[in-house]
């Protein structure tokens, strides 16, 4: 397994797919990285030379990926919570942040249902 940005990427897959195992790199970014490094998208990771791996690593080092990106996202959310913005309040309460309806769905964000027992008359 090749190790890029602290992540073991699978050897048997195409490079373009393997790069998406790194947090912060999707298909489009992976294609741009390979274009800049001058590596074909169709090559398998096991067929890459050390030189090509080095070029890919150099390009990825310029991007914000893995731990740095996760830290930035969490700090952005903390900032929203601290300043008390609407989005911060929604984050704090564990509700959808982007204006979705919460009457029926939003179970992913709210978690499993908590049933309330009926009062006997």
From Swiss-Prot:
The keyword rRNA-binding applies. One of its GO terms (molecular function) is tRNA binding. The keyword S-adenosyl-L-methionine does not apply. Keywords: Ribonucleoprotein, Ribosomal protein, RNA-binding, rRNA-binding, tRNA-binding. GO terms for cellular component: cytosol; small ribosomal subunit. GO terms for biological process: translation. Pfam families: Ribosomal_S13. Residues 93-121 are annotated as: Disordered. Residues 106-121 have a biased composition (Basic residues). It comes from the Bacteria. Belongs to the universal ribosomal protein uS13 family. NCBIfam families: uS13_bact (TIGR03631). Located at the top of the head of the 30S subunit, it contacts several helices of the 16S rRNA. In the 70S ribosome it contacts the 23S rRNA (bridge B1a) and protein L5 of the 50S subunit (bridge B1b), connecting the 2 subunits; these bridges are implicated in subunit movement. Contacts the tRNAs in the A and P-sites. PANTHER family: 30S RIBOSOMAL PROTEIN S13/40S RIBOSOMAL PROTEIN S18, SMALL RIBOSOMAL SUBUNIT PROTEIN US13M. Part of the 30S ribosomal subunit. Forms a loose heterodimer with protein S19. Forms two bridges to the 50S subunit in the 70S ribosome. HAMAP family: Ribosomal_uS13. This is Small ribosomal subunit protein uS13. The lineage of its organism: Bacteria, Bacillati, Bacillota, Bacilli, Bacillales.
């Amino acid at each position: 397994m090749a190790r890029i940005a602290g992540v073991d990427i699978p050897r048997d897959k195409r490079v373009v797919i393997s790069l998406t195992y790194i947090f912060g790199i999707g298909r489009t970014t992976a294609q741009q990285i390979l274009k800049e490094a001058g590596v074909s998208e169709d090559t398998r990771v096991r067929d890459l030379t050390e030189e090509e791996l080095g070029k890919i690593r150099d390009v990825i080092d310029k991007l914000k990926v893995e731990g740095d990106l996760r830290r930035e996202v969490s700090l952005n959310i903390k900032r929203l919570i601290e300043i008390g913005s609407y989005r911060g309040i929604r984050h704090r309460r564990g509700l959808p942040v982007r204006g979705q309806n919460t009457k029926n769905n939003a179970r992913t964000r709210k978690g499993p249902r908590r049933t309330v027992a009926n009062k006997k008359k």
